[in-house]
Amino acid sequence: MVDELGSNSEVGTLKVVILHRPGTELRRLTPRNTDQLLFDGLPWVSRAQEEHDQFAELLRSRGVEVLLLSELLTEALHSGAARMQGVAAAVDSRRLGIPLAQELSAYLRGLDPVRLSHVLTAGMTFNELPADARTDVSLVVRMHHDADFVIEPLPNLLFTRDSSIWIGPRFVIPSLAMRARVREASLTDIIYAHHPRFTGIRRAYESRTAPVEGGDVLLLAPGVVAVGVGERTTPAGAEALARSLFDDDLAHTVLAVPIAQRRAQMHLDTVCTMVDVDKVVMYANVVDELTAFTIERQPDGVTISDAAPFVEAAARAMGIEKLQVIGTGIDPVVAEREQWDDGNNTLALAPGVVVAYERNAQTNARLEAAGIEVLTIGGSELGTGRGGPRCMSCPVARDPLP
């Protein structure tokens, strides 16, 4: 099983992917907490589930094995060590106080794997605390409203791209930047450490300090990795990842790509994704301004070159004459709307074959005009968290590119 897993590109034929079907965690969203939980609206959950099921079925119809995060987590939680790890990550004694934290931890450790998996993903309100956890000595319990969260939900689990990254035959457990998402990495950590499917797989990098998120990491070609630096991934995170990849011989060149620190461009893959071995789709407004610092491995360390145009730096690192840009060079208003709706956030199933949201009609038409096969899915509800097909998928295995 170990030899089947791994990826060295964005476009090698996709074999295995991790998705998360949206569930109760989305039903926890209210007008009061959407900003805190990083959603731009209240999704119609049953419709979001239908759209996600369509996405998963499309992948299966193309021969992709779809692994669901909640099922992997439930299976991993049969391990006692996994249960301890999950409970420790979910129960914050600094926020809950020692008495409640102790009572809650004991209760959670007694849950069966299915129920514990549900709580770790969907969270728990004070109203859902069992009677024997409502200790009379807990001021925290007495002062909180019943609908407040004792364990916060993880609605952004939908975007499995960010909480783990496969580079070569190894995986990365990153540190997520936003408080609402920090605990997601603990769940992927549990899965990779305790699920038998991943026995023997080695980590490439792990950071609990400098943030790196999977949406900022593009595998441009074997040995060449681009890392967006902006709202989520920091320069320190990008540099630490680069040095780790060099040490493990997983890359020879890393491009650090500054992006605007704004919600619409939170990750590099919101403005640019690979659609073929030498083609990218890119938001028109950044084509001329996107740059990259080239970090290269050397026998005695690394060298960091001055910023150069991203497309030129990428082509040079990839060893190709030109990286073709399929721009959303349409009406500026339409281009901005479709970028906001994740028009540039495509998932490649094979060279020249991508999945995209159907609503981004003009971007999709430009891709098709450039010879790309575009497979569309609905995304009216899935998109309320600002993520597209690439964001919603963590490729675990692709056919390697030479």
Swiss-Prot record:
Record-linked InterPro entries: Arg_deiminase (IPR003876)
The protein's enzyme class: hydrolase
HAMAP family in the cross-refs: Arg_deiminase (MF_00242)
Designated gene of the protein: arcA
Catalytic site: 391
Entry's Gene Ontology molecular function annotations: arginine deiminase activity
Keyword Glycosyltransferase set for record: no
Name of the protein in question: Arginine deiminase
Cellular component GO terms, alphabetical: cytoplasm
Cellular localization per UniProt: Cytoplasm
Source taxon at top rank: Bacteria
Entries under SUPFAM superfamilies matching the protein: Pentein
Organism the protein comes from: Mycobacterium marinum (strain ATCC BAA-535 / M)
Similarity field: Belongs to the arginine deiminase family.
